[in-house]
Amino acid sequence: MCIVNFFKTLFKNKKSSNNNEDEFDWEAYEKAVTDHPLHQVFECRKLLEELSEHSIIGLYDSIDAFLFQDIHFEKVISNMPKWVCDEGISPEGSCSKVFYEKFRQKAHHPVFSKFIYYYDLWSIVAAIQDRISAVMLYMQEFYKLVPCKMNYKPEQYTSGSRHGGERETQAHVLLNSIFVSYASIFDLLSKIAVEQFMFDRYDFTNYKEMHCKKEKAMYKPNIKNIDPSLKQNGLLFTDPEVVRKFETFRNEYVHNGPWDLRSSVYYTAVDGEPADVIIYSPDMVDGHFVTSGSRNKFYSHNNRINAQLPDMIKDATLILMRTVDQISALYKKKTVRKEDPKLTEEYLNAIHDYYKSLV
């Protein structure tokens, strides 16, 4: 039973008349949903699902419409050789590099290069959806081990103990996996932004690699070769503080190892009664760890990262949604040509000639 149906059943209004048995106490229902210990996690998941299922799907659609605005897309793609889609991208393609290059040598027409590019770009967009799914999975497992809701202020704790074992290590691994997976979305989206801006420079008679690879495109606030509109306030490329936080945690974990080598989880108490379960994270200023010389992990701010994380994810996801939607809008703005039946026929004939060359 899903959580919504559970609460609807639980809080059905017992005072309702026999003629209206479906009434239930909406006020109690809303309060129960809000008070649920995982309410913030549910809200994060809803936003992440919206990013994946609405914004990213919209990006797929806008790319399809832009790249193939002058042909009958379905007719052409349905005849395209399977290796164009899978080889070098997916385990569905099982040939070697040598065979792939032989296939390419026989596929002379630019239509093959354009569809190879299409699937190259598609794989980056699909990778974003994969990272979103990973974040949701890691978050779900993480909050089975520690709570996202604190019941006390830090100054109220009267005692506490530090635990470090398999369960605590698992919690830290999941937490850092969230940071790594989420921050990788920034890099992937940077590649797509570069591709959108530089597309007109492609010559599909001689396509070898994507511009984002040549440019070594990775996320950074001063990234070049993206549309100026992507540097509006509220979008990814304006260096929002919450994005810097994800970058800081990711980079520390990837390049320097765990920021807590003991994988500590703190079990607090108030007047001898169990209180909050906490993972503390280092002090931060403007999205960066506070540093002094060689040290960058100070713990004076009482940062309870398991409580802060849901808001971080929500804030960053809203930024990503706006950014993805703007990239989609840029593709749509350049989708101005009508379908050309002659070009569609040319592409289909080129594919037919390719198949004949294999005989």
PLM regions: where:
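Acidic, Ser/Thr/Gly/Pro-rich intrinsically disordered interaction regions
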Residues: 2-130, 161-173, 191-359
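A short mid-domain helix/strand-loop element embedded in enzyme catalytic domains
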Residues: 132-169, 179, 187
